[in-house]
Amino acid sequence: DEAGAVAALEALASVREGDAYAKAATIFSVYTAINSGDAATLLGKLDPLIGEDGVFTELALELKAQVLARDGKGAEALVVLETLLEREGLERDLQTRAETLRDSLGSGS
C-alpha cells in the first residue's frame, strides 16, 4: 500500500536526522509517491537534497524533473534535466533516463 510505504519511509527519514539512511528513505518515499503525491510536497522533500550537492543530488534532480513534468511544468522540467545532464561523471543509466525524458518533453509529449 503506497500510503503505508510512504509513511514508513518518512518515519525512517525523520528519526535518522539527516544521515545517509534518512536521505535514501526520502528518495524512496518520493519515488513511491511520484505518480500520485502532491507535487509541492514532493518537491519540498527533493530541494534540500539538491541544494546540498551530495550523493543523492543527481537522483533528486531526476525525480524533480519527473514531478514537474507530471505537474504540467514541462519547461521547468527541461531546465532541471539540462542541469542534471551538465553534471560531470553522470552514471550512464541516469543519463539515458534523463535524455529520454528531456526528448519526450522537447517533442511536446
Where are each of the predicted segments found?
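Soluble extracytoplasmic domains of inner/organellar membrane proteins
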Residues: E2-V6, L12-S109
